[in-house]
């Protein structure tokens, strides 16, 4: 049972990190454009405007997807209660790997939104 609780916590880690960082980024981007923390792509780092836009947009998507992922991520874990460490670990692994898609997919949507709202040089399209 202890391993099952541990795996449930691991399975919820990605959704709750998405919610937390989504809230943080949607409310405010890191103060300075940097290559260490934040949503960092060549387009988002063009200027202050693209930096703030990208963080707000990406943060909203991550927060929403994090909440959407939380419950469906835990439900399959109930099917392996008391089944032993191998089935519990395998289920946790499958869930965690499936969470990588919604973790990474918002990058493509954010880049598309940046290209829609800004030109190649980072100037806002009116």
Residue ranges and their predicted role:
Residues 1-14, 72-97:
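Long, highly hydrophobic alpha-helical transmembrane signal-anchor segments
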Residues 6, 17, 21-27, 40-44, ...:
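N-proximal short alpha-helices
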Residues 11-22, 66-76, 99-106, 110:
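Helical transmembrane-bundle signal
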Residues 20-38, 109-113:
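Membrane-water interface of transmembrane alpha-helices
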Residues 32-47, 121-126:
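Juxtamembrane inter-helical linkers in multi-pass membrane proteins
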Residues 42-63:
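Membrane interfacial helix-start motif at the N-side
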Residues 85-125:
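Alpha-helical transmembrane segments and their immediate juxtamembrane interface regions
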């Amino acid at each position: 049972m202890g391993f099952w609780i541990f795996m449930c916590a691991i399975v919820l880690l990605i959704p709750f990190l998405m919610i937390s960082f989504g809230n943080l980024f949607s409310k405010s981007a890191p103060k300075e454009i940097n290559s260490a923390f934040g949503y960092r792509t060549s387009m988002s780092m063009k200027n202050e405007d693209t930096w703030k836009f990208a963080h707000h947009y990406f943060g909203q998507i991550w927060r929403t997807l994090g909440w959407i992922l939380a419950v469906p991520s835990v439900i399959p874990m109930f099917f392996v209660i008391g089944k032993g460490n191998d089935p519990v670990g395998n289920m946790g692994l499958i869930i965690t790997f499936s969470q990588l898609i919604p973790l990474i997919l918002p990058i493509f949507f954010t880049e598309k939104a940046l290209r829609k709202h800004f030109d190649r040089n980072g100037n806002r399209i009116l």
